[in-house]
Amino acid sequence: MKKVLLILACGIAAPLSYAQATPKWAGKAKKAVFSIVTYDKDNKIKNTGNGFYINENGTALSDYTLFEGAERAVIINADSKELPVLRILGANSMYDIVKFNTETDKKTIALKSASQPASIGETVYLLPYSTQKAATCQTGTVTKVDTIGDKAYYYTLAMTTNEKTVSCPIMNANGEVLGLIQKNASDEAKESYAIGATYGASLSITALSLNDMSLNKIGIKKGLPETEDQALVYLFMASSQQNQDEYITTLNDFLEQYPNSADGYIRRATTYMGFNDDEHNALADADLKKALEVTANKSETQYNIAKLIYSYTISLGDKKPYGDWSYAKALSIIHDAMQADNQPIYTQLEGDILFAMKKYPEAYAAYEKVNQSSIASAATFYSAAKTKQLIEGTDMNEVIALMDSAVARFTKPYTSEAAPYFYERAEIKAQTGKYREAVIVYDTYFEAIGGGGTSAYD
């Protein structure tokens, strides 16, 4: 810490040497400005710079360059208190700006964004980081204002700045923040530039941010989207791009931000179950119970839990199940859901579970109900046909009729999606001695997969 403060102290004197004015609001406003130290993967100091708070929740802005390649970062506030950077909340490498949040130890002093952009010729104030009691400011004037987005601006200033003032705030006469100073080509340059604070505040994490190159070049943990729906899409994307431990961390962050999300608990339970051990299964079981506690749609949550336990039991093989997880438990849960809200998709799952339990007549009865509903499809008729085929004493013509209904769901020209159904239909016809009809269906199958061959019965 002493080493860090020594490095920072060397940079304090530079902006003070050309201080020209001290507005009344500067004494309080300077408490929003802090210094930043970033560290590399070996925990060695990578860069030092500045930043400032834009709200009392610890949200802040700084330059992207300072954070690029960093694995962690801390801020040292005006009271010389060191606080860790917790999450990156948005970044834009082209405009060299990053949004993040830090841990807070008490009420945070934050700068209020200006409601209107600065005008050309207006006097502005550069507020540097300082641990000194007295606040000092450097003045300059606005020479150009460019619009870079919705209520977002880029300022050209008649002001000489140096490396030590990068990411310090530019204020108007009312003590409102206009932007943050960007790195200049030369310390002797007569012009400086500032990116609008409102632009920085608008940066966010979206559902697609996992593929954002600018964000991925920062090793510090990222935040989540600000709406639950977007955050759930983010979780879906993360599930295929992160390993189990990373994904668990993301899920933990999600549930911290959205503690009443039944979907979040079910997704974390699913991930825990992927570890295939009793320790994680116990955590999964607790999450499934929590999902039922917080859900706004109990039947839907019961459906998702029943489906999860059903899938778990299928994958179990000859292994001993965890606790009471079984087909019977999954069936009991889906029956509870159906009593409150008898959706066809719930009946479909009921049929799947009964089929796995080898209760074929009951499974067929469930599939028949589905086939008379709005979600009837080639797949549901196929399920009914395969189940009917396994019931002792079944007339195979009934099975063929069900497969006829399955393929009737497709229209010409047939595609590869229809091919498996035509193949199964042909197989059943061949098994019942209807070889000529089977050949015709096999030919349709070959057409569907784009082949020119014919069946073995030619």
Residues covered by each model-derived region:
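Conserved active-site neighborhood of the chymotrypsin/trypsin-like protease fold
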Residues: 55-127, 132-136, 151-154
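Flexible, gly/ser-rich surface segments that form the specificity/activation loops bordering the active-site cleft
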Residues: 21-25, 108-154, 161-166, 181-193
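Alpha-helical segment of the N-proximal tetratricopeptide repeat
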Residues: 225-278, 318
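A conserved glycine-rich beta-strand in the N-terminal activation segment of trypsin-fold
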Residues: 21-22, 39-57, 63, 82-84, ...
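C-terminal cap/linker of serine protease catalytic domains
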Residues: 21-23, 180-250
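Residue-level recognition of tetratricopeptide repeat
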Residues: 270-274, 307, 314, 352, ...
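Structural motif corresponding to the intra-repeat A-B loop/turn of tetratricopeptide repeats
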Residues: 241, 275-278, 312, 324, ...
